[in-house]
């Protein structure tokens, strides 16, 4: 509900109605709405983390892993119309800051592992620094949601994430990696997800 409606808009009454229980019962498990928001954010992050771990168990090549991880994140955080991240930052700044740090730690670990694996298998250049590249990637992805730079009506987040991931891979890939990327793009690209609405007449 928080992702679909927004952290500010959802009330404890909404939660109790959605779950089919009394508000008193909700308060038996959560002290207040802030407590519920914090637990919900942790659950979302844990779910994404477990999904990514599952992808890593599929024995894909490192570039395929990145594209599958992107699909998971977009699926889990599919509703950007309510700007849940902005609402969280504005109305629950302490929770937002904690989540931001935990999200960075999760992403950083996954990316560094992916980069090292890519170097070892010949998909990424041997001269890159995995720690630095991981942080550059993290900052870049985070910046995609800056409204003053990207009009979400013209450039929706899924489109921006696709563009940025391709940009990231091209910057670090070997010829072998570029060939793999090209194969993935041929199979994966479709106008609705890879092009902004303005480019397809919406």
Give a label for each model feature.
Residues 39, 50-83, 134-137:
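Hydrophobic alpha-helical connector segments
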Residues 113-117, 121, 154-202:
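C-terminal peripheral helix-coil segments that are non-catalytic and often amphipathic
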Residues 78-113, 119-132:
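Short secondary-structure transition hinges
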């Amino acid at each position: 509900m928080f992702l679909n409606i927004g952290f500010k808009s959802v009330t404890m009454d909404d939660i109790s109605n959605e779950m089919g229980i009394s508000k008193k019962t909700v308060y038996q498990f959560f002290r207040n709405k802030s407590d519920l928001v914090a637990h919900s954010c942790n659950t979302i992050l844990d779910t994404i983390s477990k999904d990514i771990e599952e992808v890593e168990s599929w024995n894909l090549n490192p570039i395929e892993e990145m594209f599958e991880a992107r699909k998971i994140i977009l699926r889990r955080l599919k509703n950007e119309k309510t700007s849940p991240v902005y609402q969280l930052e504005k109305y629950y700044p302490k929770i937002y800051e904690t989540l931001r740090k935990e999200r960075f730690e999760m992403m950083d670990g996954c990316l560094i592992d992916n980069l090292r694996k890519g170097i070892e298998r010949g998909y990424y250049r041997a001269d890159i620094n995995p720690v630095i590249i991981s942080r550059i990637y993290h900052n870049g992805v985070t910046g995609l949601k800056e409204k003053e730079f990207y009009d979400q009506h013209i450039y929706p987040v899924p489109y921006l994430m696709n563009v940025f991931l391709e940009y990231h891979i091209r910057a670090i890939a070997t010829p072998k990696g570029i060939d793999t990327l090209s194969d993935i793009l041929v199979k994966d690209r479709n106008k609705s997800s890879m092009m902004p609405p303005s480019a397809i007449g919406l």
